[in-house]
Swiss-Prot record:
Reactions catalysed, as given in the entry: NAD(+) + (deoxyribonucleotide)n-3'-hydroxyl + 5'-phospho-(deoxyribonucleotide)m = (deoxyribonucleotide)n+m + AMP + beta-nicotinamide D-nucleotide
Active-site residues, record numbering mapped to chain: K132
Keyword DNA repair among record annotations: yes
PROSITE patterns the UniProt entry points to: BRCT, DNA_LIGASE_N1, DNA_LIGASE_N2
InterPro entries linked: BRCT_dom, BRCT_dom_sf, DisA/LigA_HHH, DNA_ligase, DNA_ligase_AS, DNA_ligase_CS, DNAligase_adenylation, DNAligase_N
Keyword entries, A-Z: DNA damage, DNA repair, DNA replication, Ligase, Magnesium, Manganese, Metal-binding, NAD, Zinc
Binding site for NAD(+): D41, A42, E43, Y44, D45, S90, L91, E130, R153, E190, K307, K331
Name of the protein this chain belongs to: DNA ligase
Length: 691
């Protein structure tokens, strides 16, 4: 939502307060009515606290419609308004340990709890601790134990009737359990979506080519406020009860913890991550315990909630205009925050992947100061329309690498610059290329680039490549970090004295590695090609290349068209090969590897051109015993004619040659309608005739 009003300075408190009210009301409307939040929580909290402080310093600036005096937005036009019998209030927030200690002190003082001479509470208050879910608050009304209405919070006084949608949530009972139920019960709780259900929903959205949801809260809110309850019924929503509005027909329970236990007996879903504690230390202990397990919880939370446990003490403490005095939300460090993107650089990964990285003005988010954040790839930068100079939303959750979620387009400066992917690697100067149908651009200097050095050496030494026994990752780390090895060719220059000085490398280990390196000098062309670590070139493709060309030079000089003639080499593999050998840095390292005294292999003639007869490219399956041909002889003749001999029958099979006692392969061929030949039919094919 656009925020075009100019931001007044703090030296103009009346204008500043009006601007803050406008910003917060716009955010409230986007959050509560449109279900499209456009401000991170941390930014909203910052603006809200600033307005609170302004109104405290200048009481004359307080207006009846100030966001500090109410909860959220107005009911949207698509749903029937519902006036709450008991207001659905918000909670005041605490962020630091000092905030929690101050809350406990205020409560204890108001309840006339005993304190010592230093002012410390010696008669601790009992609190019920719960999770603060990141979902949508609702009220469920039961009459004589039967579910009759559900409504959203709205502005705390008036919400929206979402009864038919809530009726589709399977975890919400339509009738309460037990013989003794109240005449009227308003249950307060949260509609949310579990992480696993959110992932499945987005999978369905992708499969249907529909817009994906940004996060579980948006998905839950959007699902709950569908005008068609059939759509809501298809969404995997859940519910947890945590509070009460109206109770008629039976006395109120003595404690909040007893209320939640009673809810469970009625069949209402109540979260088990709750605890009764004493005083500020107990509150902080619960907060830390939940913080440690936060990422492993099956749903999103953004903090915990503390409530004075005894009902009579809650009543004594009462309410302020927008929140109860007996409760506090203790929020985790914000996982999203706003900052300025000052530059976009690129990083080179171990495999040559080029990743755009946002350089940011320092911002505290997710419990740490963040100055860099990933932009994933060039397509993501374009899709999110992120530009240098933008005010951006940065997200950091747990140990996840910080990322730029998006930009606030209404704050974009006139000189904001688009990101341009460089054409040369910033580390080694090799060309940057991006293969068709791939999102990631890569440095093509795989054998030369320092950023890829360890990965290139590790791959080169693999058992299926040069098979250098004893050259593990820890040894490679030392060799690279001590600048003893820069490319695979340098491995063959290592001497005994150098190796023997490596950490935890005895003389015997040094000699064993030298022996392995000497042995690795005598290899095969296929192993050497595989060892180069060319993207998309596996062991099988390396063998096909060696068989087709016979020697390395023709492969290095081959055009894409010539590479496409190789068995099982398609456009992507051909392009990858061509890019790799076109990079001069790679060719230099290869020549160093082929220098006298280094790596050698037996050369062979190029394979003859593939036959062009009726069997060329066909797949044939042999089964049973033929009258005059052994299976090996038949296979050799078929392969010489350009056919591929497979071991099982599938839809891709062109012919089945069946002899005596053919068995299940013959049955499957007949089921699939695949032509079945005897030995005479095979000879006709080999002679170029279609049977």
């Amino acid at each position: 939502m656009a925020r075009t009003q100019a931001e007044p300075p703090a030296s103009q408190p009346d204008a500043r307060a009006a601007w803050l009210r406008d910003q917060l009301e716009r955010a409230n409307y986007a959050y509560y009515v449109l279900d499209q939040p456009d401000l991170p929580d941390a930014e909203y909290d910052r603006l809200f606290r600033e307005l609170q402080q302004l109104e405290t310093d200048h009481p004359e600036l307080v207006t009846p419609d100030s966001p500090t005096q109410r909860v959220g937005g107005e009911a949207a036009g698509g749903f029937t308004p519902v006036v709450h019998d008991a207001p659905m209030l918000s909670l005041n927030n605490g962020f630091a340990d000092e905030d929690i200690a101050a809350f406990d002190k205020r409560v204890a003082d108001a309840l006339d709890k005993t304190t010592d001479l230093a002012g410390s509470v010696t008669e601790p208050v009992e609190y019920a601790c719960e999770l603060k879910f990141d979902g949508l608050a609702i009220s469920l009304r039961y009459e004589q134990g039967v579910f009759v209405q559900a409504s959203t919070r709205g502005d705390g006084t008036t919400g929206e009737d979402v009864t038919e949608n809530v009726r589709t949530i399977r975890s919400i009972p339509l009738k309460l359990k037990g013989k003794h139920v109240p005449a009227v019960l308003d249950v307060r709780g949260e509609v949310l979506m579990f992480k696993r259900d959110f992932a499945r929903l987005n999978e369905r959205q992708r499969a249907a080519e529909q817009r994906e949801f940004a996060n579980p809260r948006n998905a839950a809110a959007g699902s709950l406020r569908q005008l068609d309850s059939k759509i809501t019924a298809q969404r995997p929503l859940s519910f947890f009860a945590y509070g009460i509005g109206v109770l008629d027909g039976m006395p109120m329970l003595d404690t909040h913890s007893a209320l939640l236990d009673w809810y469970e007996s009625l069949g209402l879903p109540v979260n088990r991550e709750r605890e009764v504690v004493q005083g500020a230390e107990g509150l902080l202990g619960f907060f830390r315990k939940i913080g440690e397990k936060r990422e492993s919880l099956p749903y999103d939370i953004d903090g915990v909630v503390y409530k004075v446990n005894r009902r009579d003490e809650q009543e004594r403490l009462g309410f302020v205009s927008r929140a109860p005095r007996f409760a506090l939300a203790h929020k985790f460090p914000a996982q999203e925050a706003l900052t300025k993107l000052v530059a976009i650089d690129v990083q080179v990964g171990r495999t040559g992947a080029i990743t755009p990285v946002a350089r940011l003005e320092p911002v505290f988010v997710g419990g740490a100061t963040v100055t860099n954040a990933t932009l994933h790839n060039e397509d993501e930068v374009r899709r999110k329309d992120i530009r240098i100079g933008d005010t951006v939303i940065v997200r950091r959750a747990g140990d996840v690498i910080p990322e730029v979620v998006g930009a606030l387009l209404d704050r974009r400066p006139a000189d904001a610059a688009e990101f341009v992917m460089p054409t040369e690697c910033p580390v080694c100067g090799s060309k940057i290329e991006r293969l068709p149908d791939e999102a990631i651009a890569r440095c093509t200097g795989g054998l030369f680039c320092p950023a890829q050095r360890k990965q290139a050496l590790w791959h080169f030494a693999q058992r299926r490549a040069l098979d250098i026994d004893g050259l593990g990752e820890k040894i490679i780390d030392q060799l690279v970090e001590l600048n003893l090895v820069r490319t695979p060719a340098d491995l063959f220059n290592l001497g005994f004295a150098t190796l023997a000085e490596l950490d935890r490398f005895a003389e015997k280990s040094a000699q064993n590695l030298l022996d392995s390196l000497e042995k690795a000098k005598h290899t095969t062309l296929a192993r050497f090609i595989y060892g180069l670590g060319i993207r998309h070139v596996g062991e099988s493709t390396a063998k096909d290349l060696a068989k087709h060309f016979g020697s390395l030079t023709p492969i290095m000089d081959a055009s894409i068209e010539e590479l496409l003639e190789v068995n099982d080499v398609g456009p992507i593999v051909a392009e990858s090969l061509h890019q790799f050998f076109a990079e001069e840095h790679n060719r230099t390292v290869i020549e160093q590897l082929r220098a006298p005294g280094k790596v050698t292999w037996p050369e062979g003639p190029p394979a003859p051109k593939a036959p062009q007869g009726v069997l060329a490219g066909k797949t044939v399956v042999l089964t049973g015993t033929l009258p005059t041909l052994t299976r090996d002889a038949a296979k050799e003749m078929l392969e010489a004619a350009g056919a591929k001999v497979a071991g099982s029958v599938s839809k891709k099979t062109d012919y089945v040659v069946a002899g005596a006692e053919a068995g299940s392969k013959l049955v499957k061929a007949e089921e699939l309608g695949i032509p079945v030949l005897d030995e005479d039919g095979l000879h006709q094919l080999l002679e170029g005739n279609t049977p």
